[in-house]
Structure formats: C-alpha cells, structure tokens
C-alpha cells in the first residue's frame, strides 16, 4: 500500500487530530457524530483505526509500518514503546518536532531536496534513524535557510519534547536522547497497533 496523498481533512474527521499529516483540526464533535452514525465499532475496527492513525500521522506505507513492528518485536522492552521510539526518531519526524517543517510531509520534502545536514553531511533519506548527539541543521544555502526560517516563524510556539534542543540561530537542532513515550506527539494506543499485526500474522 502506497503513502497516502488524498484529502487530509477526510482522514482527521474519521481518525481525529493527526498533527504530522496536517495542522488542521477536526471540528468539535465530528468524530462523535461519525461514531454514532456507524454504530458500535468492532474490536477489529478499533485496532485498525489505531494502526491507520499511526500510518497517516507519520506518513509511512503499510509495508514500512510492518517492518518497524517486526524490528520492535525483536528489540528488548515493550514492543509498542519501541515501535513509537523508532517512528519518533526518524529524521522527517525530528524536523517536524523541532518546528523546522510544518508537517511530516513538508519535512520529507526538505530531506528529499537535500536541504538538511546531519552531523555536517547531507542526508536525503527521510527515514534516517537519528541517534543521541546527532546535530541537524539547514545547508548553508539561502533557500534552505529561508525554508526553515519560514516554518519556524509560522509554527506555534509549543514546548519542545525533552529529547530535543533547538538553537534558532543558525537553525540547529540537537537530539539529546531517545524519546520518552510521554513526549510522543500523537494520542495513540500503541498496544492496539501491536495487537492488530499479531492477529494478521
């Protein structure tokens, strides 16, 4: 299944706020109306919708998400927590959380167009897994700096998660540590996602 490129508001109306996909918010009560129209949701549908929230928020394909679930299963610790850490430490998501891009698709464009340096080197892979002590900044080019400056000027001043630090001049981000689950940027029940895949395999 390919990456979603359809109407974004349609997704947030059904699944709730997906800040990585769009900074628009569903109208108050719209999700409740949708639920009442569709009647009682089955356990399968509840798990499916949690999985879809994860996919659309982080802007990944079904195949990519399944790959992350398999990696998380093999790691030490809670599979759900490890899964969220893997997704949160992607370069495109880190740029979004720093405010250097308005959405994760916007961050992916920055990376694909070679505007971003990690530890002084161009990285053009949005799924690049960031590590503690990685530094992330714009290339020393006017267009790259202008794109990030524009995003920072327009983004709401929200508290940065504790695993990140942003120096606004010269637009340099630092990964301090692996993210703690309470700082994940999405309201999600990751255990339902793990359950969804455990029943598919």
Swiss-Prot record:
The organism is Spinacia oleracea (Spinach)
Q: What is its main location?
A: plastid
Q: Which NCBIfam families match?
A: PRK05327.1, rpsD_bact
Name it.
Small ribosomal subunit protein uS4c
Tell me which family the UniProt entry assigns to this protein.
Belongs to the universal ribosomal protein uS4 family.
S4 RNA-binding domain boundaries: 89-149
Region annotated Disordered, chain positions = 15-43
Q: Which GO terms describe its molecular function?
A: rRNA binding; structural constituent of ribosome
Among CDD domains, the record links this protein to: S4
